[in-house]
Amino acid sequence: SLKVKALGIGGHVGFPEGSIHALYVLTEALKDLEFFQEEDRRLFQFLCRMNGDFYGNGAGIACEDELSGALCGALNIARYQEDGSKKYVWMQSDHRYPITGAVGAELGERLVHLAGLYGCKAVIKKDEKPYYLDPESDTVKTVMSAYRTVTGKDSRPFTMSGGTYARKLPNAVSYGMSLET
């Protein structure tokens, strides 16, 4: 029996600067230990590749664009599960990819391929495409005009990597999460 504890520094996957991923710290410590079976070590090595940095370099999915910046994210949940005689590790990945250029399906295919290299099987269950409204659209201009009238500030709209509720409504604008103080 082995008990290991790993500590990280919490953060938001959309703004990872200064964060340390506890799952990476854990798997980096375990990935080469002879204590574990080869199959387990390969899983730990895969998790290290996925979480070695928050920008997709180790996983081979790094990309960026001028509008939204670099892809950022992590494989952020891993849970051991048993279903009858079947044992597996369920994982959840949260990657915010750029508005232009990268396509979620293509990035997903790369992750599935990478998992296969380590004897793992990955299945992409969901792809929430980036949401973007042109700052020159009437919708954004109207919201910004109201904002400037109420606050008296001459702020400019910007794009961030957060997942937004606005994608659920056509032509919706999310704002207020990063108001100037």
Where are these regions (language model features)?
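Zn-dependent metallopeptidase/amidohydrolase metal-coordination segment
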Residues: 2, 83, 87-89, 94, ...
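Metal-dependent peptidase/peptidase-like ectodomains
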Residues: 1, 15-23, 79, 84-88, ...
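Structural signal for hydrophobic packing residues in well-ordered secondary-structure cores
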Residues: 30-38, 111, 115-119, 147, ...
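Amphipathic, soluble alpha/beta structural segments
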Residues: 54-74, 123-152
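General small-molecule cofactor/ligand-binding pocket signal
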Residues: 5, 123-125, 156-158
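Midchain, well-structured core segments that form catalytic/ion-binding scaffolds
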Residues: 1-99
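A short, flexible beta-alpha/helix-coil linker loop
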Residues: 9-12, 129, 180-181
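Intrinsically disordered, low-complexity boundary segments flanking structured domains
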Residues: 58-64, 111, 159-161
